[in-house]
């Protein structure tokens, strides 16, 4: 009887740990993450204090914090080729990283680190040197900065067949030296690395290339991590939030369902389908059933995004900053519809797949500069600073814990819906005007459309909508309007 009770207790404890890894530890009603791709730590700290905190963002996904290989021209992907677990990159050193985490936590913005547990650097012509000056010899799988030697890696092989589980989880993804996570030494070093980041105050991790690691190995690693630190504002026994990169468009040998019990999973189907819809390849009316009916993961298990740093470079249906009108509409729908754990992208401009982030003549990252409207210049796109996006972060905060109601569509690509009695949004993706009296579900009053303008000192710089006693309001979105979306909510009442 004792053995049974003890075993049951262990099962309950394990289940609790797994469920806890889905909790992003947001402050208050905040519920949107932004990926500040390739930003420096000092710049992120300032952005948390000056913009993200005041605008109600919940967290930041930051680029890999550990030492990476120095590659000619400094392409973005060098950050995904580890040399050691020293916290020195072009984004800054350990002291700067720790200062960023502390300052962001103090203003209610959590930090999630992109981590590389699957592999180390690929082969390199000449001496491989990292951003901390550490030397390595990837050709013989020697990484003395950890240290790792050949016995810590799977035997070298290439992935030829994406329906072969062994190749996917044992061979080298684009030549990257594939760690053997079943080895005690490898597990120990990975856990030490993640625990060090936890000690510095991070809230969790985005796990790169998770599908290339056996889920049972990841389960052991995640389960061995320390709790988050109470001195950084986390409750007792809080577990790190885990979200895992698992590319699964269906029909895959390794599936997202193998990982979603361990933490959230990146829902790439969301990105593909929302791009299809707002590119006009699918009528918006079908979005009424958005979510699991589309074959997506359950809401609490899905990390959702319009684009990410990888697929924005791959073309196809995925929308990016290069199609700004449709991109803003897709992002507005993403943040208005109650599905998933939302992440928005903050990019730098690129002309080809390998483009480096903005850098100076010495190949050091440069800080973003801001124009008179608060947008970014000098090579940084900063979608999160576009009014249509940061105001939808505020909309999402205002309507948190409400459901969809009063869906309306024209049978094609004009749609509208309420979020409880707190928010209303409408879209026009047709080539003709939308002009309708619609149920907004809001109390009587005049509301500022947070897409076309800001509410500043009681005045709206954009459109406004009058809502009567019956909740009805006249909604107008012309086909040639700068934005094809209108959004109002209780916190934007004039």
From Swiss-Prot:
It catalyses: Endohydrolysis of (1->4)-alpha-D-glucosidic linkages in polysaccharides containing three or more (1->4)-alpha-linked D-glucose units. Its cofactor is Ca(2+); chloride. It is an enzyme of class 3 (hydrolase). Gene3D superfamilies: Glycosidases, Golgi alpha-mannosidase II. Belongs to the glycosyl hydrolase 13 family. Residues 1-20 form the signal peptide. This is Alpha-amylase-related protein. SUPFAM superfamilies: (Trans)glycosidases, Glycosyl hydrolase domain. The modification Pyrrolidone carboxylic acid is found at residue 21. GO terms for biological process: carbohydrate metabolic process. Binds 1 Ca(2+) ion per subunit. Chloride binds at residues 206, 308, 343. It is found in: Secreted. Disulfide bonds join 48-104, 157-171, 376-382, 418-441, 448-460. The record marks 310 as: Transition state stabilizer. Its main location: secreted. GO terms for cellular component: extracellular region. Its EC number is 3.2.1.1. Ca(2+) binds at residues 118, 169, 178, 212. Keywords: Calcium, Carbohydrate metabolism, Chloride, Disulfide bond, Glycosidase, Hydrolase, Metal-binding, Pyrrolidone carboxylic acid, Secreted, Signal. The active site is at residues 208, 245. GO terms for molecular function: alpha-amylase activity; metal ion binding. Monomer.
């Amino acid at each position: 009887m004792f053995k049974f009770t003890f075993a049951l207790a262990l099962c309950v404890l394990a289940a609790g740990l797994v469920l806890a890894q889905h909790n992003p530890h947001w402050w208050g009603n905040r519920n949107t993450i932004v990926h500040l791709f390739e930003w420096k730590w000092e710049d992120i700290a300032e952005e948390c204090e000056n913009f993200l905190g005041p605008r109600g963002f919940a967290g930041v996904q930051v680029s890999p914090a550990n030492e990476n290989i120095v590659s000619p021209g400094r392409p973005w992907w060098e950050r995904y080729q580890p040399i050691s677990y020293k916290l020195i990159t072009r984004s800054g050193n350990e002291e700067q990283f720790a200062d960023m985490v502390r300052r962001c936590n103090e203003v209610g913005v959590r930090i999630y680190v992109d981590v590389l547990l699957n592999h180390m650097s690929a082969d390199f012509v000449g001496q491989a040197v990292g951003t901390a000056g550490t030397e390595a010899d990837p050709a013989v799988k020697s990484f003395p900065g950890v240290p790792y030697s050949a016995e810590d890696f799977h035997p070298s092989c290439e992935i030829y067949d994406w329906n072969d589980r062994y190749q996917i989880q044992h061979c080298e993804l684009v030549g990257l030296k594939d760690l053997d996570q079943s080895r005690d030494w490898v597990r120990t070093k990975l856990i030490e690395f993640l625990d060090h980041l936890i000690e510095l105050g991070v809230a969790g991790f985005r796990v790169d290339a998770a599908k290339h690691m056996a889920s049972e190995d990841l389960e052991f690693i995640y389960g061995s991590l320390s709790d988050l630190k109470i001195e950084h504002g986390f409750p007792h026994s809080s577990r790190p939030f885990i979200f895992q990169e698992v590319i699964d468009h269906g029909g895959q040998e390794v599936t997202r369902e193998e990982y979603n019990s361990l933490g959230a999973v990146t829902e790439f189907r969301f990105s593909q389908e929302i791009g299809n819809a707002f590119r006009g390849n699918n009528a918006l009316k079908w979005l009424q059933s958005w979510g699991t009916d589309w074959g997506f993961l359950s809401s609490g298990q899905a990390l959702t995004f319009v684009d990410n740093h990888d697929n924005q470079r791959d073309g196809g249906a995925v929308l990016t900053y290069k199609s700004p009108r449709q991109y803003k509409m897709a992002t507005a729908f993403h943040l208005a519809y109650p599905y998933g754990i939302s992440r928005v992208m903050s990019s730098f401009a690129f002309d080809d797949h390998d483009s480096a982030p903005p850098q100076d003549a010495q190949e050091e990252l440069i800080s973003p500069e801001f124009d008179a409207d608060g947008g970014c210049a000098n090579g940084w796109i900063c979608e999160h600073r576009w009014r249509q996006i940061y105001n939808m972060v505020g909309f999402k905060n205002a309507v948190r814990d409400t459901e969809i109601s009063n869906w309306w569509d024209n049978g094609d690509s004009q749609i509208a819906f309420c979020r409880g009695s707190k928010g209303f949004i409408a879209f026009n993706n047709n080539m003709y005007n939308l002009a309708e009296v619609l149920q907004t579900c809001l109390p009587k009053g005049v509301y500022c459309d947070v897409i076309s303008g800001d509410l500043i000192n009681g005045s709206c710089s954009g459109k406004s909508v009058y809502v009567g006693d019956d909740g009805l309001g006249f909604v107008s979105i012309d086909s040639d309007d700068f934005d094809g979306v209108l959004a109002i909510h209780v916190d934007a009442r004039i």
